[in-house]
């Protein structure tokens, strides 16, 4: 089995995004912890050798190839090791590939900003000893609810965001989506097609896999 190194942290949603992708295509992951609280991600050696902007995660492949940014890492893993997987349509099929990139762009531009901001206010701020700004948190919830109107329109016509197959575009939602589902359940269960999509996505990638990603860092 292929084994890759993943530099990251247990509670990093972006680290979980890569871990989940790797496990879905049968790639083993060796976790290399990067302690954000100690500032290890800002040390010169890390900046020079792993991530020029000093964030996580970073993948190191068996041949020494290093890739950073969680969505880029996930695409790389599936392109190299997930042959035949529906997670990433082949560029040789322009329509399927274009619809996938469209859906992936929706996650990146419409879902991630308010979802990650809500998670920061309600969870990560407290981990840093900061108080939650409830006014901001409510703003992010309102934004997510408005975005779900667009999701409902898409998902009323197809099972998943890029069509009728589960792809990375759906998987990319899972780490922050799991947090949103706990923090504000109505965001993902108040609209019938969004609710069905979320349930179907969790059947493909069980919640236990997202939880287990943290255990490998211990």
From Swiss-Prot:
InterPro entries: Glutathione-S-Trfase_C-like, Glutathione-S-Trfase_C_sf, Glutathione_S-Trfase, Glutathione_S-Trfase_N, GST_C, GST_Phi_C, Thioredoxin-like_sf
PROSITE patterns reported for this sequence: GST_CTER, GST_NTER
Enzyme class: transferase
GO molecular function: glutathione transferase activity; peroxidase activity
Protein name listed in UniProt: Glutathione S-transferase PM239X14
Enzyme Commission no: 2.5.1.18
Keywords noted in UniProt: Cytoplasm, Detoxification, Oxidoreductase, Peroxidase, Stress response, Transferase
Reaction equations catalysed: RX + glutathione = an S-substituted glutathione + a halide anion + H(+)
Tissue expression pattern: Expressed in vegetative rosettes.
Domain GST N-terminal as annotated: residue spans: 2-85
Pfam families (UniProt xref): GST_C, GST_N
Record GO cellular component, one term: cytosol
Family according to the record: Belongs to the GST superfamily. Phi family.
Biological role stated in the UniProt entry: Specifically catalyzes the conjugation of synthetic 1-chloro-2,4-ditrobenzene to GSH. Also functions as a glutathione peroxidase, converting linoleate oxidation products into their corresponding hydroxyacids. This enzyme may thus serve to protect the cell from oxygen toxicity as well as from exogenous toxins such as herbicides.
Record's subcellular location: Cytoplasm, Cytosol
Taxonomic classification: Eukaryota, Viridiplantae, Streptophyta, Embryophyta, Tracheophyta
Top-level division of the source organism's lineage: Eukaryota
Organism: Arabidopsis thaliana
